[in-house]
Amino acid sequence: RRLTPVLLMVIGAGGSLAMTVIGKQVIDRARPARALAVPPYETSPSFPSGHTLNTWVIVMLIGYLVCLRLHGLRGRVAVVGVAVVFGLAMAASRVYLGHHWLTDVLVALTLGSAWLIVVVTGHRLALTVKRRQHEASSSS
């Protein structure tokens, strides 16, 4: 049980990192002109925004794991709200600083959200299977 949060974070972060690396290699999109950017300058391809994709996945997974421990709706809404604001602030900063095009961060948020759906659904499915196995063994 204690390994589950670590495993979720490793799977989530590993998947988002893989999407970032593969996306940058396949698309190989140039970044905005350096005259538009704030130093230090990035040298890797622009698409997708790795900062946005990885931050979104990690922060939202942390929010999900914290929400699993909370019982009240107010606390859960606050946790999710903070996670969303932090993730969107990262996305906005990448465009504002001139390191990415808007589409780089929008696609990163979309890819990250899709990956979160897969990871969280897998976790919920595993919890359901475990609960049903426990109920079946208890009723026998």
What is the predicted role of each segment?
Residues 36-140:
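Membrane-embedded catalytic cores of phosphoryl/pyrophosphoryl-handling enzymes
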Residues 1-42, 62-68, 81:
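Hydrophobic alpha-helical bundle signature of multipass membrane enzymes
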